[in-house]
Amino acid sequence: MSSAFKFGELSVSIFGESHGKAIGVVIDGLPGGTKIDFDAVLDFMARRAPKKDGTSTMRNEKDFPNVVSGMVDGVLTGTPLCAVIQNTDQHSADYKSVSYLARPGHADYTGYVRYNGSNDLRGGGHFSGRITAPLVFAGAVASQILESNGITTGAHILSIMNASDERYDPVNVNAEQLKQVRNRYLPLINASVEQQMRDIISSASANLDSVGGVIEYAAVGLPAGIGSPMFDGIENRISQIVFGVPAVKGIEFGAGFDVADMFGSQNNDEFCIENGEIRTRTNNHGGILGGITSGMPIIFRVAMKPTPSISRPQQTVDYTTMTEETLAIKGRHDPCIVPRAVPCIESAANLAILSYLI
């Protein structure tokens, strides 16, 4: 499987399966001599952990990254950084009755065809959201390196169904605002919508269903001039890694699809001078023009599909016997993956941005 990417000097390779012994990541190209706050890494990863309030899976994994190379006494050595996370709370028996039933919304069937029937189906195998744990470790390390270069990143839940948070101010969002939501139970700018979101998730769960949502990301402190045109633009790199997060189905930068309903005079961001720096008065371009940063905040949003594992009966097929079947999924699943996916989206984008700086 190609669960790896290489952009410039940075390469990241993720390994393991949801119900295997362990999962992990190898990161090459990180700058030697960089001090990493390991407690801060653990705090970052804890944001991805299941909540104990009915909004996420009951699977309980400690997700402690055992660093086996590339770091000594909290300092990066410059050689490949490898971290391994043990899987300790698998319930593989939940999947025996559905081994060859194509779960709607999952990659069981496509993986079976792609890998000639050899893919690990337990818990989704390598296609599982479980595999984002090592991605978030890598993203946590990247976040610290970015911050040491004056770049602050963050994300929040923009919406779950019809419950919507405020958007980041695309022109004036700042580092302090990005940091404020990081440790909130649900990462929201406007905490008053939290209960509405909880009610939507609880209702879906009670109805044996699930819901999706939208996550918004921002990065501030990037200078103008980072990126490349056409096929290696900063949007391209961000999108490629973001789509490695299971459940992501769409991405838009700046004003996104709204630009299709604008005149050029509305969409164009006029330039100005502020405190001796070139800026734009608006930021419909999301901080990127021609694949290159403009110096304005990078802003993008991603659409997360509802968790496909639901307990409602669904029609499917057994792809080994070629018969139609009825499927009722058992096990422990998130009625809404969006809250736990916020640090995953941050991690993906952080790594993409970091790839231009090393």
Describe the function of each predicted region.
Residues 1-358:
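Generic N-terminal targeting/processing segments that precede catalytic cores or assembly contacts
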